UniProtKB/Swiss-Prot annotation:
InterPro entries, sorted: Ala_racemase/Decarboxylase_C (IPR009006), Arg_decarb_HB (IPR040634), Arg_decarbox_C (IPR041128), Arg_decrbxlase (IPR002985), De-COase2_N (IPR022644), De-COase2_pyr-phos_BS (IPR022653), Orn/DAP/Arg_de-COase (IPR000183), PLP-binding_barrel (IPR029066)
Keyword terms of this UniProt record: Decarboxylase, Lyase, Magnesium, Metal-binding, Polyamine biosynthesis, Pyridoxal phosphate, Spermidine biosynthesis
Requisite cofactors: Mg(2+); pyridoxal 5'-phosphate
DNA damage as UniProt keyword: no
Protein's name according to its UniProt entry: Biosynthetic arginine decarboxylase
Length: 637
């Protein structure tokens, strides 16, 4: 989607490279969402949408899901494979299988299954990794013949549920993750009078480097070694059931950044396929698992939160490697499945919330130390004078190192009782003023200055207290240092010369974001527009659609946020679905076995012995009762 030239924010926040065309900034400095890239004129003003939600009784924070983006992601992936298979003459068929563990929200799964034209072509399937997920999948799978892949550990009940799904007309592949599952599959299939569709997960030597590398390769929790795969083949042969071995599955890892890792794994998988085919296994489908990345940071690199390839390049490599090996061996091209849940869902949702407070570095006017003041204060004053003197022979780097040394002396002398509290405060004021003056003089074009600039940006950054819980809404930031694009959604037509570090509202020092996407790569501070009290900033946390909702926890008892689905109608106007109300205080207390009715009774008992007037007791009790039904997040600010 074309950028609006009016806003420098596109470059500052690197929007074009991580948003994949779904986000832009208009001339008024407000973020717009383009959910359907085929209708680039149909844009949704995100601040205006947020205001309309608040007027309708949906306060911040709120998670907004753009369902048209889900449709677009499905079709982008299917179109890439369809184009490659057609151009290369590949004779297998591709199906995009969605692992619902990535985001089990019913509305998300339903939208993925209804994405046209992929849905009508029966190119969208589902994957389950547990009995509860399988129960959901069996209800949601629409068409007869739709693909369902059953992964994870399986007991007899899980296997029977999967076979019932096959009885219902679905193509249910039961993937053998452990050898002990195979006898159960054969026994239950015989009881139900059905020929199962059995898959085998091979544990490859290849791994995709990154945060999730141990989900694939030899350290993988799941899958069979080469000898165990051969044991499965022998067991099926002895049972006269080799014809049931229909699928080969492997998994390199999640969010694979480097296309070379994918190529290497595909070659290993292709060898498994051709060898099994030569042994008489009639495998007709290869499930290449997950791994298709998402460029969260927009650097198009091998960084763990980026990717150095496109969706089309991914599809080409999958098809090319398997086709080449099959043609070399003279065997049929298998149908293809990928489990690309992150690539399908990451872009579709954004958390929008408000800034509740700011904390600025000390900006008081420094005063000259007394003649008898300790040496570190005198040194800081001389450093400040050097910065004010245009003819000073001292370099900026030299002054920076000197003020660091002086402040280290200040801290040491204060700890040993050699400086008073007033003198320490005076030193801090001098230090901050020196840092501000240095930052204004340093030039990012000068390579020698860049590291100092980064350090000063961090030292001078304001703390931005934002109405959300990192542990609930962005748990991967805390858990694995995942990077998500974060930026204001309004005020972007103002000068972007402030820097900040985002803090959440939990009582936990880990409730902050330490890495931010910007035009220079990954930084430790976030660029912000100048503060305008008449136009408070709203913050957007983007690309949160994969894993974050289901992994979020209730640290400090902050619960689920409000959420809404937004879709475009035929005229390009947006329609808001029925909001899903976020957790109330009473609801989260029930999770930890506090019954609200018992709490209210405890409050009543305390009031009876409080000595307060009856009228005041009732007023305060009503307020406590109302508090139990309130939102867990801050409702003012």
């Amino acid at each position: 989607m074309a950028e609006t030239a009016a806003s420098p924010a596109h470059k500052v926040y690197n929007i074009a490279h991580w948003s994949d065309g779904y986000i832009s900034v208009n001339g008024q400095g407000e973020v717009e969402i383009c959910p359907d890239r085929g209708r680039s004129d149909a844009r949704i003003n995100l601040p205006a949408l947020t205001r309309s939600l608040a007027e309708a009784g949906v306060p911040l924070p709120v998670l907004i899901r753009f369902t048209d983006i889900l449709h677009d992601r499905v079709n982008k992936l299917c179109n890439a494979f369809n184009k490659v298979t057609q151009e290369q003459g590949y004779r297998g068929r591709y199906t995009a299988v969605y692992p619902i563990k990535v985001n089990q929200q019913r509305r998300v799964v339903e939208e993925l299954l209804s994405a046209e034209p992929a849905a009508s072509a029966n190119q969208v399937g589902l994957e389950a990794g547990s009995k509860p997920e399988l129960m959901a999948v069996l209800a949601l799978a629409k068409q007869a013949g739709s693909v369902i892949v059953c992964n994870g550990y399986k007991d007899r009940e899980y296997i029977r549920l999967a076979l019932i799904g096959q009885k219902l007309g679905h193509r249910v592949f039961i993937v053998v993750e452990k050898q002990s599952e195979l006898p159960l599959i054969l026994e239950e299939a015989k009881k139900l009078g059905i020929s199962p569709l059995i898959g085998v997960r091979a544990r490859l030597a290849t791994i995709g480097k990154g945060n999730w590398q141990n989900t694939g390769g030899e350290k993988s929790k799941f899958g069979l070694s080469a000898s165990q795969v051969l044991d499965v083949v022998d067991t099926l042969k002895q049972a006269g059931a080799l014809g049931t071995l229909q699928l080969l599955h492997f998994h390199l890892g999640s969010q694979i950044a480097n296309i070379r890792d994918i190529q290497t794994g595909l070659r290993e998988c292709a060898r498994f396929y051709t060898e099994l085919h030569a042994m008489g296994a009639p495998i007709g489908t290869v499930d290449i698992g997950g791994g298709l990345g998402v460029d969260y940071e927009g650097t198009r690199s091998r960084s763990s939160c980026s990717m150095n390839y496109s969706v089309f390049e991914y599809a080409y490599n999958v098809v090319h490697v398997l086709q080449s090996e099959c043609d070399r061996q003279g065997i049929p091209h298998p149908d293809l499945i990928s489990e690309s849940g992150r690539a399908l869902t990451a872009h579709h949702s954004v958390l929008v919330t408000n800034v509740i407070d700011r904390e600025y570095p000390d900006n008081r006017e420094p005063t000259e130390p007394a003649a008898e003041a300790p040496a570190p204060l005198q040194d800081l004053w001389r450093d400040l004078e050097s910065l004010q003197d245009e003819d000073s022979p001292r370099s900026l780097a030299e002054i920076y190192h000197d003020i660091l040394h002086a402040m280290a002396d200040v801290h040491a002398q204060f700890a040993h009782g050699l400086l008073s509290l007033q003198e320490r405060a005076q030193a801090e004021t001098l230090y901050v003023r020196c840092c501000r003056m240095l930052r204004a003089e340093l030039d990012s074009a000068n390579r020698a200055h860049r590291e100092i600039i980064d350090e000063l940006n961090e030292k001078l950054a304001e703390k931005l207290f934002v109405n959300f819980s990192l542990f609930q809404s962005l748990p991967d930031v805390w858990g694995i240092d995942q990077i998500f694009p974060v930026m204001p959604i309004n005020g972007l037509n103002r000068s972007l010369n402030r820097r900040a570090v985002i803090q959440d509202i939990t009582c936990d020092s880990d409730g902050r974001i330490d890495q931010y996407v910007d035009g220079q790569g990954i930084e430790t501070t976030l660029p912000l527009p100048e503060h305008d009290p008449e136009s408070p900033l709203l913050m957007g946390f983007f690309m949160t659609g994969a894993y974050q909702e289901i992994l979020g926890d209730m640290h400090n008892l902050f619960g689920d946020t409000h959420s809404v689905d937004v879709k475009l109608d035929q005229q390009g106007q947006y329609q808001v679905g029925e909001p899903i109300t976020g957790d109330t205080v009473a609801k989260v207390l029930r999770y930890v076995n506090f019954e609200p009715a018992n709490l209210l009774e405890a409050y009543r008992q305390k009031f009876r012995h409080s000595g307060l007037s009856e009228e005041l007791q009732q007023t305060l009790l009503a307020e406590l009762s109302s508090g139990l039904e309130g939102y867990t997040y801050l409702e003012e600010g």
